[in-house]
């Protein structure tokens, strides 16, 4: 039986039970401790050198929480992954660049402490939904954030952004018309140069060790579909492996909440992608 099929069959019978996992909550990744700069770790009870998944929640860059992970920790721990879900500070209390700094610091913590939880510090997969997908894609392409933490993109083995429409902010604004949405103004400002700098597509280049991408989007959302395919095209032009999967019958919310659910097609695509990285 194929590994993914076996997982889905097993999950159907055992998801009701708690996984055999070690769970550590509210771990600070900066000092002094700030509630918005903490993370939770879900790790297999045994094993070493397991890949590490760092999950970034969504919420329009100004709300959300690391606890909103639904079935994901259970699903990935059962497959032998260390699952880390991180908080980060919000706009407008801090700038989007400071938010990116938080994400890089969370990755630094995962790298430094992975082995304590049976994880491989040099095999980190970054994932996120909505605003978290933008943050994931940006930290995996703009290497300056990890460099500020003394790291490089080499420690990242994969990136899975889930349903976001701002891989290329200037292009997105052109498609939306002359007036950008209010959220865009608050988060990205109004300067064209800042829009380019905060666009993951801007930082794509060959030879940077950008990790492989699996880009998930809701099939019926034209803006995320267009941006996903445009971003993937640019990644491939730079020699980066990129796969786009359209999730049929999903909403912006359910593509996230259903990840890890038995029989979910995006989950199956995700597990197959992860399997190729091991």
Q: Predicted segment positions?
A:
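Sec-dependent N-terminal signal peptides
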Residues: 3-13
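Alpha/beta-hydrolase superfamily serine-hydrolase fold, recognizing
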Residues: 15-278
